[in-house]
Amino acid sequence: MLDQRLVRDNPDLIANELGRRGITLDLTGLQLIAQQQRNLEEQRSSLQAEGNRIGKEVGQRIQQGSDPKASDVAELRQQGNLIKQKVAVLEDEEKQLSARLREQLLSLPNLPSPDCPEGRDENDNQERHRWGKPREGKDLLEHWSIAERLKLFETERSVRIAQSRFVTLMGQGARLERALINFMLDLHTSKGYREVMPPVLVNTASLTGSGQLPKFAEESFRCAEDDLWLTPTAEVPVTSLHRDEIIPAEQLPLRYAAYSPCFRREAGSYGRDTRGLIRLHQFNKVELYWFVHPDHSQAAHAQITADAEAVLQALELPYRVIELCTGDLGFSSSRTYDLEVWLPGAGAFREISSCSICGDFQARRSAIRTKDEKGTRLIHTLNGSGLAVGRTMAALLETGQQSDGSVLLPKALVPYFGNDRLEPE
């Protein structure tokens, strides 16, 4: 959430920065609410000061021997009571305005970083670097064809169980998924991340704090009777792990590696990626999440991206790093690097991780602060997939496919899977 004082006092700056995202917005109404709230604060503060003065004068007169029931003292007390009533009315009006202001601020996305490249959409994103040599060939299969030959997952039966865009992993497929999750968690925890397995059902406050609500309500599955939602990413519960807390600066950074199933309705994606593991309603993911001191967030962004890249390198999967332009940024992000893995069968790069710096945007929504010698201020948060497990499996299948129908696995994964390849049953 944006700083309401910044929106109130610098509306042109906010409008210009949101314009970099391609958003044209009239902030007049929001600015008016913020100014009304400020006026009420000033009136309340003035009345409270007058009330304190009257209370002090009453005390002094009594100390000097005045009868507490004397008319002059009683008149002062009556004035004090009237002021208290006026203050109560102003406080109620402030609360109402504050709720309206927060509702509008929650709908505004984060401001892009000054370092973020300008652009309108994904066509203006900029490639930063590549790793590995992409495998190419005319006869290479896409991952769902390989999975069908190896009987790695059930699609039609999953429709019977749930609906389309669900899969049931079977046999070697289920084993490979489990191996990948354990491998990713072990790799990250060996670098100092603390492992987390959070709830997959989260409340509205958690989704609001991370930035999914109110904008992305249609993208999420909701248990309406219980005010609970299926989490679209572990970023949501991990953000709220420290909601309404003050974290001492000496404890920072806090670095978490969280595994969770993720659930997304994929509204608006009809007809896209209807086969295989690329776009599902339910998928597994290992999420990296940092709480950092505001002075250290830029360096942390480089490191969290490198930690996500390390998974792809260990699995010998060629990829490229793309920096998103201002017009393609996610709602809560101020700067993002996407990792795109090469899929030889598809002959294309596909996103497998987004590593984002959110600044104090999520921290303000979730009231997460830190305290150092300079005082108490909002913390900075960062997140990145480390990695999306299903898409990693798809890349492994297409990269390691052999002419005999087997799939050769990278050496780093062999101890977790128990074999160096997937073989036809």
From Swiss-Prot:
Entry text on domains: Consists of two distinct domains, a catalytic core and a N-terminal extension that is involved in tRNA binding.
Enzyme class, first EC level, given as a word: ligase
A biological-process GO annotation: selenocysteine biosynthetic process
Name of the protein in its database record: Serine--tRNA ligase
Record keyword Signal present: no
The protein's assembly and partners: Homodimer. The tRNA molecule binds across the dimer.
UniProt entry tagged with the keyword Protein biosynthesis: yes
Keyword terms of this UniProt record: Aminoacyl-tRNA synthetase, ATP-binding, Cytoplasm, Ligase, Nucleotide-binding, Protein biosynthesis
Range of residues in the leader sequence: none
Record field: catalytic activity: tRNA(Ser) + L-serine + ATP = L-seryl-tRNA(Ser) + AMP + diphosphate + H(+); tRNA(Sec) + L-serine + ATP = L-seryl-tRNA(Sec) + AMP + diphosphate + H(+)
